[in-house]
């Protein structure tokens, strides 16, 4: 990018510096693009190009086929502070050793500071264009004095930095929306949901809902808890003048009455007599619901575990009536005679003996049961068939 590199290309032929608006080339190297404004500063930094005569420069510039010299142009001089408006064409001595080549490579570093100063001073004097080094941050001060436009650019950079700082703070608040907010009504700092009133102020969830439902601000003083119904202050039964009850009622006139007087008036239609007033509140003694179920379950279990003697004395035991001279024809059944007093009484009435058996412990054949009972229909072999025969 630096034009001085092209000056060390050829050793046999002299290298010429052709000051065109955009190109600098020698006889043995391709042209290199160089801005026109940097050419005077570069030529000023090269001492062996300043010894050329001005007449020779003007002669070659006039004979150049591609460009014509203007009337107001003048030759470039090292003492002239302004950049030339025309073009110069000068010879340069041949470069014969490696030291000149090294100097050519070092020339960009040598001309860097001077070119920057010359370029910057020119722009400061004209005041029409900003500095080309304005992209450098504010922490890197330039080597020339800041002009009008450069100062404005620095101020704009500082303004952008301040805006970026504000933007970052706003983004931080948006990232944590609950931070730094306070309810304007109760002063709460944290709430599940932030709301706004009609003026845009922040309200906590409770105050916002209260304002939305009631149309007014939520009261800061919490209301006192209501007393229990049995100890409400200032309440007294208009009938019996008691102040203790489980439930306060109202009569037809809207006056408060105790639970007892209110129920009595509701059921009988007359006021409750004062003679029925008691000092203590009578409560109903309700039986627990599980007691009845427990009794039925225990009764069934005891009846199932009773002995045969107790079974014979119980009333619901099935009874099978047979003739006195007939013996049992079906196997597996034990016939138990009843006591004589009981059997004699039954003989007088029925003229037969009663035999009791255990239906749960024995099985019976259907043919024997049908022959014994005198039934023509065969019985099904089930445990409850003996109950049907009773």
Swiss-Prot record:
<keyword id="KW-0677">Repeat</keyword>
<dbReference type="InterPro" id="IPR000679">
    <property type="entry name" value="Znf_GATA"/>
</dbReference>
<keyword id="KW-0479">Metal-binding</keyword>
<dbReference type="GO" id="GO:0008270">
    <property type="term" value="F:zinc ion binding"/>
</dbReference>
<dbReference type="InterPro" id="IPR008013">
    <property type="entry name" value="GATA_N"/>
</dbReference>
<feature type="region of interest" description="Disordered">
    <location>
        <begin position="76"/>
        <end position="101"/>
    </location>
</feature>
<dbReference type="Pfam" id="PF00320">
    <property type="entry name" value="GATA"/>
</dbReference>
<dbReference type="GO" id="GO:0000978">
    <property type="term" value="F:RNA polymerase II cis-regulatory region sequence-specific DNA binding"/>
</dbReference>
<dbReference type="InterPro" id="IPR039355">
    <property type="entry name" value="Transcription_factor_GATA"/>
</dbReference>
<dbReference type="Pfam" id="PF05349">
    <property type="entry name" value="GATA-N"/>
</dbReference>
<feature type="compositionally biased region" description="Polar residues">
    <location>
        <begin position="76"/>
        <end position="100"/>
    </location>
</feature>
<dbReference type="InterPro" id="IPR013088">
    <property type="entry name" value="Znf_NHR/GATA"/>
</dbReference>
<dbReference type="GO" id="GO:0000976">
    <property type="term" value="F:transcription cis-regulatory region binding"/>
</dbReference>
<keyword id="KW-0539">Nucleus</keyword>
<dbReference type="GO" id="GO:0000122">
    <property type="term" value="P:negative regulation of transcription by RNA polymerase II"/>
</dbReference>
<protein>
    <recommendedName>
        <fullName>GATA-binding factor 5-A</fullName>
    </recommendedName>
</protein>
<dbReference type="GO" id="GO:0005634">
    <property type="term" value="C:nucleus"/>
</dbReference>
<feature type="compositionally biased region" description="Basic residues">
    <location>
        <begin position="283"/>
        <end position="292"/>
    </location>
</feature>
<keyword id="KW-0804">Transcription</keyword>
<feature type="zinc finger region" description="GATA-type 2">
    <location>
        <begin position="237"/>
        <end position="261"/>
    </location>
</feature>
<keyword id="KW-0863">Zinc-finger</keyword>
<keyword id="KW-0010">Activator</keyword>
<keyword id="KW-0238">DNA-binding</keyword>
<feature type="region of interest" description="Disordered">
    <location>
        <begin position="279"/>
        <end position="324"/>
    </location>
</feature>
<dbReference type="GO" id="GO:0045165">
    <property type="term" value="P:cell fate commitment"/>
</dbReference>
<feature type="zinc finger region" description="GATA-type 1">
    <location>
        <begin position="183"/>
        <end position="207"/>
    </location>
</feature>
<dbReference type="GO" id="GO:0000981">
    <property type="term" value="F:DNA-binding transcription factor activity, RNA polymerase II-specific"/>
</dbReference>
<dbReference type="InterPro" id="IPR016375">
    <property type="entry name" value="TF_GATA_4/5/6"/>
</dbReference>
<feature type="compositionally biased region" description="Low complexity">
    <location>
        <begin position="293"/>
        <end position="314"/>
    </location>
</feature>
<dbReference type="GO" id="GO:0045944">
    <property type="term" value="P:positive regulation of transcription by RNA polymerase II"/>
</dbReference>
<dbReference type="GO" id="GO:0048738">
    <property type="term" value="P:cardiac muscle tissue development"/>
</dbReference>
<keyword id="KW-0862">Zinc</keyword>
<keyword id="KW-0805">Transcription regulation</keyword>
